[in-house]
């Protein structure tokens, strides 16, 4: 919830209103939480994103997602920001935008999950906390506790992580002109 809420809030605070959102469908818990975070941030800014700019589909459903990306990129007025919470679609998004003659980040600001680590090529990245190392250390400690317990297994323990995500600009980048007046953001661009 939190990571998607923060990313959406950042996009809206930058003044973008013509945006697209991609994520797993709400039949999966992460998809449900992310959609709620997206909607809550939009509600906070009084923004309604048209349904044709929202795509909710599992990763396995490649044809509709490809069609959505190519449709969005080729519109007369394409979105100025795309919030992506579908894992592993960074290169496909770049290919769809490039084939339509759009530049990142000058024409379209991409944000959200960056599994392929492509955004640093454009002068910014997404800081996602807690890191994979934090998750791995917690899982390893729980596993060691179970192994060391022998036959007397410890009580199952549930750890809840609150994720956070924000853009980090490594250099001065030119983002698309906003649709509305920007508001104050937490991020200080270099």
Predicted region positions:
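Hinge/beta->alpha junction and helix N-cap segments in small-molecule ligand-binding domains
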Residues: 1-6, 22-68, 83-91, 113-116, ...
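A generic "cationic amphipathic patch" detector
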Residues: 17, 24, 32, 51, ...
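Short acidic capping loops at alpha-helix termini that bridge into adjacent secondary structure
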Residues: 17-18, 49-53, 103-109
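Flexible loop/turn connectors
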Residues: 69-189
């Amino acid at each position: 919830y939190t990571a998607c809420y923060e990313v959406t809030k950042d996009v809206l605070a930058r003044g973008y209103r013509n945006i697209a959102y991609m994520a797993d469908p709400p039949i999966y818990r992460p998809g449900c939480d992310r959609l709620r975070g997206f909607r809550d941030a939009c509600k906070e800014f009084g923004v309604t994103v048209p349904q044709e700019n929202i795509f909710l589909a599992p990763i396995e459903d490649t044809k509709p997602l490809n069609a959505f990306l190519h449709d969005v990129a080729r519109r007369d007025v394409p979105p100025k920001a795309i919030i992506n919470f579908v894992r592993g679609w960074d290169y496909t998004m770049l290919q769809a935008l490039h084939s339509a003659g759009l530049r990142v980040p000058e024409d379209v600001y991409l944000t959200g999950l960056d599994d392929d680590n492509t955004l640093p090529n454009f002068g910014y990245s997404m800081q996602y906390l807690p890191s994979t190392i934090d998750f791995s250390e917690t899982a390893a400690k729980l596993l060691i506790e179970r192994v060391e317990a022998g036959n007397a297994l410890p009580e199952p323990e549930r750890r809840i992580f609150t994720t956070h995500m924000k853009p980090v600009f490594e250099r001065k980048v030119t983002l698309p002109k906003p649709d509305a007046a920007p508001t104050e953001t937490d991020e200080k661009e270099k």
